[in-house]
Amino acid sequence: MSEQQVYVRFSEEADAAELTAVYKRNREFFDKFSPISLEEHYTEEHQLQKIIKSKADRIEDRKYSFVVCHKEDGRIIGSIDLSFVVRGPLQNCMIGYSLDQAYNGKGYTTEAVKQVVRYAFEELKFHRIVGEASPRNPGSIRVLEKAGFHKEGISRSNVKINGKWEDHQVLAIINPSEDI
């Protein structure tokens, strides 16, 4: 695989229809490892409202929402969020991502996560980023490990997925810069 098969950028209002299509197309796949989304999540209007809110969140340093685009044609194939932003002495956040199942296994998610981590460290000056993944989703754990995250432990009964509380593997990456 050659370098740079995908790129990330902040989501824009014009992305609502394409994001909705990605979520609809992958609903069954995403629901295996994610909290159940309300029906409205799969509407263009809801995605548009999320994008509008994401701009305010970014300005107020609360959350950063990106889309993952295939470099060849610019098509949106996924999304990545930096959320649960904590400043002050912690300077950390949590990363979450989803990628169209048709593009899994090609290294695209790892590449996109690396790009967002670089931005988070260099531009946003985070000290630490945490990622969590279901032990039933070894592919997601591998994404984080390949992006430089290290395992820290298991968060017991952490997230309710499909009506059942599940454990999650906790991984983190530390900014190597001393200038934070």
Feature roles, as predicted:
Residues 39-40, 52-67:
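A short helix-loop-beta-strand connector motif used in the catalytic cores of GNAT acetyltransferases and
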Residues 29, 37, 59-60, 165:
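Bulky hydrophobic/aromatic packing residues
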Residues 31-52:
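Conserved GNAT-fold acetyl-CoA-binding loop/helix
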Residues 1-18, 23-32, 65, 69-180:
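Acyl-donor (CoA/ACP) binding surface of acyl/acetyltransferases
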